[in-house]
Amino acid sequence: MFDFSLEAIVYAKAITLLATVAVVMMWLFYYCYRLKQKNEVIFGTHHAAYIAYSVCIIAWISSNAYFHTDLLPELGASAGMFMAKFANLASFFAFAFAYYFSCQLAAEQRKGKVHRWQQGIFVSLTVYSLFINLRPGLTVEHVDIVGPSQFIIEFGPHTSYFFIGLVSFVVLTLVNLVAMRTNSSKLTLAKTNYMIAGILVFMLSTAVIHLGMTYFMGDFSLTWLPPALSISEMLFVGYALLTSRFYSVKYIAYLALSVLLVCAIFVLPLGAIFIPLTESNQWLIAIPICALIGITWQLLYKKTSRYASFLIYGDKKTPVQQILSLEEDFKLSIDDAMRRLGKLLQIPNDKLRLVTSNYNETFYEEYLSSNRSVLVFDELSEELEYKVSAKRSMKALYDKMSSNNTALVMPLFGQGKSVTHLLISPHKSNNQMFSNEEISAVQTLLTRVQSTIEADRRIRQSRALANSIAHEMRNPLAQVQLQFEALKQHIENHAPVEQITLDIENGQAAIQRGRQLIDIILREVSDSSPEHEPIAMTSIHKAVDQAVSHYGFENEKIIERIRLPQHTDFVAKLNETLFNFVIFNLIRNAIYYFDSYPDSQIEISTKTGPYENTLIFRDTGPGIDETISHKIFDDFFSYQKSGGSGLGLGYCQRVMRSFGGRIECKSKLGTFTEFHLYFPVVPNAPKADTLRTPYFNDWKQNKRSNEHKVAPNVQINNQSPTVLIVDDKEVQRALVQMYLNQLGVNSLQANNGENAVEVFKANHVDLILMDVQMPVMNGFDASQRIKELSPQTPIVALSGESGERELDMINKLMDGRLEKPTTLNALRHVLGNWLNKNTASSACEAERE
């Protein structure tokens, strides 16, 4: 009677094969579990073929393990012949289902069915294989047994045809997978590469050992190896089916080489000690050897992996290690670290961006927080292609990423698992996919530097606050200074009380504009959430009228260039204070270009819809380049405008979200810019007429400034020098012109660099006072052009810039610098330095007169 004990299977080869069976079974259970999680259909798809293939692999490995145990000699030749035929059929069906699996994949890719001729090959070879293996003497005639792992199988006359069938399946499977690569996406190529790699390892080892060594050479000592290596196909193919994110070939080669080097270090010396020992003593020494390997593995792996990295990448640090080493770089400079990260990821120059959670594409956050940790464009493409149910929910996201050339969106999570920043990357310059190791490394890096990034954001916020207030307050302060100078003149000339009162009122209005600017800037940089502010139903016409009427315009010329909505009113839920600041911000951005674009206007209109209503804020100024229009809602992003915080439009987006809506930008460079403010339709809302006051038809009259024209046209005195004043702000030009009038110097004006070059060409100019930051053409470019025309003409910067780069450019391209707003004494000093003595003396005489 047969007596089974565990000692019968305690052989290294048998244990290896049974361990492989355990791994394959666990993988198969995990695979089925993942399919259930994803609600995948199994029957009629490639999943059914893969599961059948996996079951056959388990049967094949188990049957091979039998030949390396004590069961082989104990049960005898008849049982050995049965297990040999069983192993034949198990291996055949593994190859057959692998082939059918590839047919099913190819059919799904072309959105069709498996070809009839492919089904015919599968059925015919299966029937033939069953026939020759079930009928005695056709494939296995006898098994000569010496002991475990020591046996010889005598093959039958049909064995060669049986192996030809197996080889045919191998070839046809590879043909199917290679054919799938034609006109495939990058993701499909990666999947097929993994499958081909797994199939090649398994099938080639099977072909070489089973065909070469057993059939032709009669050596059965290595028959355990192909079943053990079958795990490679299981894992490679299964991994490719379950995931859409893959490790690069180089990284896999690096890991494999590192492990092989460590194994070589252990095998060579320990093998010399272990092999000469008797079998009983081998088990005694095995325990301390295993302990030694466990203790020293990590240390040796760390040392040898450097050499593996050098052989694979040409550097002792892998790209993953180089990415993780950027942690210290982020602490020194986030911008520099981002540039280095982009270079490591092979992203085009400065295209890798780290934006705050106020980014325009809010649905990025919705997807990231709900069902995935990273958005990868190629993965979305595959989901849309193969999953009909996913098309509705992801088509808009796919289209947005496609239009913005976005390949990767990765979140940074703050407290409460809320998204604080987004890492947004375009496609790689080499058009390759992001590998799994790159994505994992970047995620780890961003997690480590999260606190650094948040601290940097707060520092930038503080700098933006200081810079913006300093820059924006120059114009109101210049206006106050201008009114004081006018007031001084009027007092000296004994002007009537009404005129003096008017000067004081104009000065007070300038101070009020300054206060309003400070309020706007403080709102922009505030961390307070707009969601906490109360909202109420109101007429959108009323809200716009009130916002515009409360804005502090510099003069009535600006007011005359604004058109308010007169038709299609609607009800919106909003907070009037917050809405006012949104309109203030849009007006401020638009009128910044009014001097340089004298024909530009602001037109505010409305449009209603079934689900949302729209307020359209349109200005016909310079427009915005389409390539950067999606960036304008990023924090700290500023376009052709100096001194701003870069936070205004991000603040507008936050406010609109708090109203349940959003703001989007549509622009055409050189033609117009439109901001569309979307408000959700208010259900059961009263008529808009009942929520509004009568139209502010007289708002322009209420806002008209009685501003004194302190800078009238001046008659040119040919005996006096001429100074060209270049500044995009009228109040700054008016102040300088007033001082020049007092000094008896002629003046010409230009509102941007391009205009300055034209005025210089048409007039004789002795000195130029040049602002630095202006639309159309900045002061640096204008100075360079003027110096090419007349190198001797002095150019003095009229600027409040204090940045190191700007000061270096001023020293390089200009002849001096004058603070803005300037003073009479400072201007007199500049005239004395740069105009000839006769000109300076005549100016002084004119002043004394």
From Swiss-Prot:
Domain Response regulatory stretches: 722-835
Protein localization: Cell inner membrane
Main location: membrane
GO CC list: plasma membrane
Endoplasmic reticulum keyword on record: no
MF annotations from Gene Ontology: ATP binding; phosphoprotein phosphatase activity; phosphorelay sensor kinase activity
All copies of domain Histidine kinase, residue ranges: 468-683
Residues carrying Phosphohistidine: H471
General function of this protein: At low cell density, in the absence of AI-1 (autoinducer 1), LuxN has a kinase activity and autophosphorylates on His-471. The phosphoryl group is then transferred on Asp-771 of the response regulator domain. The phosphoryl group is transferred to LuxU, and ultimately to LuxO. At high cell density, in the presence of AI-1, the kinase activity is inactivated, and the response regulator domain has a phosphatase activity. LuxN phosphatase acts on itself.
Protein name as annotated: Autoinducer 1 sensor kinase/phosphatase LuxN
Source species taxonomy: Bacteria, Pseudomonadati, Pseudomonadota, Gammaproteobacteria, Vibrionales
